[in-house]
Amino acid sequence: MDYVIRPLTPADEAIVWEMLYLALQGSESSTPPPPEIVRRPEYARYAEHWGREGDRGFVACDKGDNGILGAVWFRPPPEGTTPVLAFAVRPGHRKLGIGAALLTQWVRANPQQDEISLKVQPTNPAVRLYERFGFKIAQQSDDAVTMRREI
């Protein structure tokens, strides 16, 4: 599959919302949550008014039809809290290297980011991908793993 990775722009807010919903769906075998879950304040803060100062991210697009394959993005958090990286790859396009390419692009573009975290379901195979990029398990419960990367 040929794809291109480009920066997310303010015009891509709809893509960020779509990818946020995919990120919240969890594993492909779980029942997806209702689409309106993204409007809950604890999740909407990752997408609402995308393109503000400090918002950074990348999207992978199919070279053939320009379809969205995945995205990785970051929004500066309130002072004193660890920043959270949001990340999603569309089902059917996972395990093809797209996630690794997105994370590589994000890490290269943000060398000054000395601390970042992400949350993932413990059964998600992407845990191994995150570990390859230096993320380590910081907290674990039955339904979520918080991973942190420090440089």
Task: State where each predicted segment sits.
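Conserved acetyl-CoA-binding loop-helix of GNAT-fold acetyltransferases
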Residues: V89, K95-R108, E131-R132
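Acetyl-CoA-dependent GNAT
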Residues: P10, Y21-G92
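Short hydrophobic/aromatic beta-strand or adjacent loop that forms the aromatic wall/cage
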Residues: D55-G57, S141-T146
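Conserved N-terminal entry element of GNAT/NAT acetyltransferase domains
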Residues: M1-A14
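Conserved acetyl-CoA-binding loop of GNAT-fold acetyltransferases
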Residues: E131-S141
